[in-house]
Amino acid sequence: ALKFAEFAKFKPEHRIGNMNNQELVKLTDALQSYDDFMAPDPSCLAPLGATALEKGMQRFFEPDFLAVVQRGASAYSGFPFIIEMGIAYGGKISSHGIKVYRFANRIPLLYDEGSDVVLKVVNDTDWSRYKIKGDPPLVIVSHICSTRVPYKTVGKENVADRPELERELKLALLSLSRKLSSFMAKKGQAEAAKKRANLYTKYIPLI
């Protein structure tokens, strides 16, 4: 408590009941930005697990590149959650642009994807930074595991863009995108080397 009070620049003896509106706003902002709170207990959650997600994506997509990540437990409004995500490129994936598969507590979300927080994070990503252009053969699988998924509607088909969820989704996608970028760079180098070799094979007999 003392450490947080120092971070928020409040005196430890300052009571919440005596705070004015401006101080309450300042306290709320500090609570949202403070990173040293204890992580929530994830024992009540049932994530897929990185290994199971990787095996499932490998079997279904047979990609040239595959990476998965499971983020540590976080919380929004006191409800714990875990973000799991996988990204796959090439192989049997068709070249029709980025395809996103969304799951929440192991249940696929099939409708109303346009206003979903996962789609928002994917669409806000500058894919050209990761050497992805045009309509790539790229698949993203996202799983939100929580004691209370913040659905936008009673139909439970899209997830609200809570800041805590959005932050964890962005960090998961950033981690995977960097790995994909490394793969694409190596792929480009290999293709360039192959072109050079073909040129040498073509013109060396003429020298």
Mark where each language-model region is.
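Short helix/strand-bridging catalytic loops that position acidic/His residues to coordinate divalent metals
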Residues: 9-14, 156-160
